[in-house]
């Protein structure tokens, strides 16, 4: 992968159209999680330091090509100004002359790109209209890179283009994790359904040395091996697919790790009475809601031998104690190895980040991706249009 960064661009006196992802949660008109806003600060700061005028392009929600007032980006303005420590000009529909008349140190936020029907269609006319506003295009929205939209893909083919600091960090971390990794490589994949992560599992077994499967997905694999999983969430219709993945892994020399012991309960609620049992002894009326301590001990051994770890999805029902034990313990083991300098750890996906934050170890991982769908599609081995456009620029 080769792409230009801000270091390769002459920005002084230039209008820099900067695609960012500030699609943040909002309640009662207030941003409730500023993580994505905070992570674009280095890019905006660097553009200003190099004499450029950043014009921020972003989407918010899914207005589907129509103006929806409650999805205006104006709502993020206070949080954006606080993160940057400077005022931001909100110009819903900027034109070139207006931008050229602004003082050099100005930051501009344009209106929701998805208000325009041409955005999600990657309409060439919209891409050209956007490109006419600036001199340079900077994509700092890896989390939107799996979408071939006018502001992520079309525009990059019309202007000198580069990756912003967050995009650069994401791409370098992911390349380090799966492109040219330090081996052995272990992937942890959790979540509810095999059907949503088929492409991911199929790609990973050919690229990693160890694959840890957790959450509801593990139940499907256990059932495919003839193990009774009781009343647990499981996709029994995916049994043949699960067996095919296991056979593919065996051919590729990838070891699959499933729970050895399980935590079961008859109610899915906080504080519900639970038991820890061997994986083969799940009661018919009970649900598997977490992996047990024997499984965690085995995972710690896998992590101790590994040099690179990629994590997507929790190992159990981490939202509800006590079914967060395996996720928390495994996360802490990975974090400890990272701090000791023996393991490179990269994690992504909404539930994954929430689980690592809950375990209190997110800051100890080598890299936490802000992307959801883009992170998954990259792990699936797919080409991301927003990245491909930068490579072609």
UniProtKB/Swiss-Prot annotation:
It is an enzyme of class 2 (transferase). InterPro entries: Phosphoglycerate_kinase (IPR001576), Phosphoglycerate_kinase_N (IPR015824), Phosphoglycerate_kinase_sf (IPR036043). Its EC number is 2.7.2.3. It is found in: Cytoplasm. Its main location: cytoplasm. The keyword Cytoplasm applies. One of its GO terms (molecular function) is ADP binding. Pfam families: PGK (PF00162). It catalyses: (2R)-3-phosphoglycerate + ATP = (2R)-3-phospho-glyceroyl phosphate + ADP. This is Phosphoglycerate kinase. It comes from Dinoroseobacter shibae (strain DSM 16493 / NCIMB 14021 / DFL 12). The lineage of its organism: Bacteria, Pseudomonadati, Pseudomonadota, Alphaproteobacteria, Rhodobacterales. The gene is pgk.
């Amino acid at each position: 992968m080769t792409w230009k960064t801000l270091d390769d661009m002459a920005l002084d006196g230039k209008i820099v159209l900067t695609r960012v992802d500030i699609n943040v949660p909002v309640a009662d008109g207030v941003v409730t999680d500023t993580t994505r806003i905070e992570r674009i600060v280095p890019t905006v700061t660097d553009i200003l330091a190099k004499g450029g005028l950043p014009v921020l392009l972003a989407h918010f929600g899914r207005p589907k090509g129509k103006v929806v007032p409650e999805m205006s980006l104006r709502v993020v303005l206070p949080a954006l100004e606080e993160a940057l420590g400077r005022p931001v000009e909100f110009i819903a529909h900027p034109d070139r002359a207006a931008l050229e008349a602004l003082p050099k140190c100005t930051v501009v936020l344009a209106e929701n790109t998805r208000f325009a029907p041409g955005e999600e269609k990657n309409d060439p006319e919209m891409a050209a209209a956007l490109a006419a506003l600036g001199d340079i295009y900077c994509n700092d929205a890896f989390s939107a890179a799996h979408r071939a939209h006018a502001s992520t893909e079309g525009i990059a083919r019309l202007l000198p283009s580069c990756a912003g600091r967050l995009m650069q960090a994401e791409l370098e971390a992911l390349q380090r994790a799966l492109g040219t990794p330090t081996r052995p490589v272990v992937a942890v994949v959790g979540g509810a359904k095999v059907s949503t992560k088929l492409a991911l599992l199929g790609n990973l077994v050919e690229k990693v040395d160890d694959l840890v499967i957790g959450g509801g997905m593990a139940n499907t694999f256990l059932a495919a091996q003839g193990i009774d999983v009781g009343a647990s969430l499981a996709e029994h219709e995916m049994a043949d697919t699960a067996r095919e993945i296991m056979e593919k892994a065996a051919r590729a020399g990838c070891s699959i790790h499933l729970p050895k012991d399980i935590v079961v309960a008859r109610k899915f609620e906080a504080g519900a009475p639970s038991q820890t049992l061997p994986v083969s002894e799940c009661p018919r009326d009970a649900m598997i809601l977490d992996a047990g301590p024997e499984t965690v001990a085995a995972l710690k051994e896998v992590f101790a031998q590994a040099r690179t770890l990629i994590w997507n999805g929790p190992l159990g029902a981490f939202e509800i104690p006590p079914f967060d034990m395996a996720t928390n313990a495994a996360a802490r083991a990975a974090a400890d190895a990272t701090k000791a300098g023996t393991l490179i750890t990269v994690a992504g996906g909404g539930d994954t980040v929430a689980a690592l934050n809950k375990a209190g170890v997110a800051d100890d991982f080598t890299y936490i991706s802000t992307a959801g769908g883009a992170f998954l599609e990259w792990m699936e081995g797919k080409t991301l249009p927003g990245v491909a456009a930068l490579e072609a620029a």
